[in-house]
Amino acid sequence: MKPSIVLYKNIPADLRERLEQHFTVHAFDGLTPDNHDELRQALQQAEGIIGSGGKIDEAFLQQTPKLRAASTISVGYDNFDVDALNAHNVLLMHTPTVLTETVADTIMSLVLATARRVVEVAERVKAGEWQGSIGADWFGVDVHHKTIGILGMGRIGLALAQRAHFGFGMPVLYNARRTHEEAEQRFNARRCDLDTLLAESDFICITLPLTDETFHMISRDQLAKMKKSGILINAGRGPVVDEAALIEALQNGTIHAAGLDVFEKEPLPVSSPLLTLPNVVALPHIGSATHETRYGMAECAVDNLIAALTGTVKENCVNPQLLKK
């Protein structure tokens, strides 16, 4: 008899067929076990779950007594209580290798859009304001040969450094827990403390995950240390930045602009002051949102779940210590 799994996000038909070759698949639109009897029953029998979003914590795990593996269609896993998963001997799989280049492209697009005011001036054209030669009030600032500061030098940070160095001739600073030899050798990147990075960078790009250490890592004091001409880009996790402090800094000119793909609350409330500021480019968390990459992420998550439930895990496991038990 095939193991039972719960699929809680729509995936391409061919990938669902692959799951069905290995498992009995119960498909749902999201995870709401408290409100959905059929889902609750499926979770009682599920040995694996696969999807994205939803809060997977102790309360959830109490409803999944047979669960052996969870496969998230994402690189981030801050919605999972890893300690609770460990206590229940549940493997957590994610997709860190698939989306690197696409997210780096998104970050670079935010750098360009904020510097050259692409969204703002495009809207002015659509509004009929382009009536002759443009003046200084339409101008942006250069990107090439400006200094980029990268918070977090993982896969995405490295891919961003490559684009900045080779594509735009930008000096690269980075802040990370350890020296990244490849970044320093290939891109002449310089590791520095956070205060130095804030003070010297023209563009500060956040690629960090959300942890206890990174929560509100950028707040009022840190924003005050940036150049007044500085631009903040966040494509890591929203709560890494104190959003209220950022709004204040953008309103009073402490920093020049911000490009944001992530927010403290998502979707971003329509009442957010960020949506009223012309010096903000706000995207709906589209860092990995291309057809090719989203397919690749789903494919990787399917492979991960199959590996986890057949005892063939070689990569992409958040809690590999469980494999030794």
From Swiss-Prot:
EC number: 1.1.1.79, 1.1.1.81
rRNA processing in keyword set: no
Stretch forming the signal peptide: none
GO MF annotation, one: hydroxypyruvate reductase (NADPH) activity
GO CC annotation: cytosol; plasma membrane
EC category name: oxidoreductase
Gene3D superfamilies, per the entry: NAD(P)-binding Rossmann-like Domain (3.40.50.720)
Key word Kinase present: no
Family: Belongs to the D-isomer specific 2-hydroxyacid dehydrogenase family. GhrB subfamily.
Name of the molecule in the record: Glyoxylate/hydroxypyruvate reductase B
Organism: Serratia proteamaculans (strain 568)
Lineage: Bacteria, Pseudomonadati, Pseudomonadota, Gammaproteobacteria, Enterobacterales
